[in-house]
Design a protein with these regions (language model features):
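Charge-rich, well-structured scaffold segments of protease-associated domains
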Residues: 2-4, 10, 56-174
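Active/ligand-binding-proximal structured segments within catalytic/core domains
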Residues: 3, 12-61
């Protein structure tokens, strides 16, 4: 038993299904000095498995007319797909695959780290309001994981590695 709980809420108004997979892991579960790792791993779960190439997960969802995305918070990370209801089995298989079989190498991880750094620049570093919120949160939660930004501190994101990402994935996902 891996603790997976399934909740099904029927809605017959449209022939679509929305699948959300919520992992009980987020930024608050990161080790000191590894801020941003939970969010980084969220990005990396779209980068391929033993049976899917990098980016193929989202391409397959789009090919069947669906959409997908993910988000990270302090206490959880969630992945979702919305597709025609007859494609539910397809997306469940894809999620099960990346839940167990993520494959990472520096060729995939290092460019994605740059993507996360750019995301931080655009959302936080280039926004005085976002910088203020980040500093207020840091002051409110001294010596607590909630004081670190979910996206991570720039200097710590720069030091995230393939090994750290795989260790986090194995501990919290696989």
């Amino acid at each position: 038993d891996n603790g997976l709980q399934v909740v099904v809420i029927e809605n017959d108004r449209a022939p679509i299904v929305l699948q959300m997979l919520w992992y009980r892991v987020g930024a608050a579960d990161e080790k000191p000095g590894e801020s941003g790792l939970a969010h980084f791993v969220e990005h990396l779960l779209f980068k391929g498995t033993k049976t899917t190439k990098p980016g193929e997960f989202s391409r397959r969802i789009a090919r069947i007319g669906g959409r997908d995305n993910a988000f990270t918070s302090y206490d959880f990370t969630a992945y979702f797909q919305q597709v025609a209801s007859h494609e539910l089995e397809t997306i469940m298989r894809l999620e099960a695959d990346r839940m167990q079989n993520l494959v990472l190498s520096d060729d995939v991880v290092l460019p994605e780290r740059d993507v996360v750094l750019e995301e931080r620049r655009s959302r936080t570093d280039n926004s005085p309001a976002a910088q203020l919120r980040e500093q207020v949160r840091r002051a409110l939660y001294l010596n607590h994981p909630y004081g670190r930004p979910v996206i991570g501190w720039k200097s710590e994101i720069e030091n995230l590695t393939t090994e750290k990402a795989l260790a986090f994935y194995r501990k919290h996902y696989a």
